[in-house]
Amino acid sequence: MTNLQRFKNRKALITGAAGGIGSALVKALKKEGALVAITDLNTSNVDADANFDGDLQNSQFCDELPLLAKDKLNGLDILCNVAGVITRGNINEVTDEEYNLTMKVNVEAPFRLCRASIPIMKKGSAIVNVSSCWGLRSGPNHPLYTMSKAAIASLTQSLGLDHAHQGIRVNAVCPNEVNTSMIRSGFEVRGLNPDKAIEELNKTIPLGRIAEPEDIVDVILF
């Protein structure tokens, strides 16, 4: 396959870079010539041009990260908010701690990162926020997760309207099931074998399989 180099010398910041979608996105961007800064709790196993280990629950870290990435890469053209957590259980089962974690990582962190990135971005820059199909149409027993992803979908629309005149594109990607540790952990919590559960789930998909991280990356890069 031809290496298109669509992102040659573009500077990108990716959150959740140690996860399934995040790590695949880092590889794809670097393959196409981008300079990539990344963050996660531990990024030691991810090859990037700038690694910033940190906790997205830390507001100051989120506020400062885009400028740190810009200084390290000599610019910032792309922000991809990929990091996320999922909390399972109905409203009477989830705790205040789980609420705070979900809102901090899934909503406040992307908000702060977008707010800090936009002033230092030039015309032609892009922001991609990873929401979820459940952010558009809710599913059962995940009120915290679905609420947080709906917030990100709404935030994305607002930012797209507010900053189009600056030539900054803001889009959301809303995946369904993706073969990552997040979905596998859900099967484990329910006492299911993740591999067998995914095999059964694959049978419900017209293509014969759920999405792989690389499928979502293709959409993000578009």
Model-found features: residue ranges?
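Active-site loop immediately N-terminal to the catalytic Tyr-X3-Lys motif
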Residues: 92, 137-143, 165-166, 208
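Canonical Rossmann dinucleotide-binding motif of NAD(H)/NADP(H)-dependent dehydrogenases/reductases
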Residues: 5-35
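Alpha-helical segment proximal to the catalytic Tyr-Lys
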Residues: 119, 161-165
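Residue(s) in the substrate-gating loop at a strand-loop-helix junction
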Residues: 132
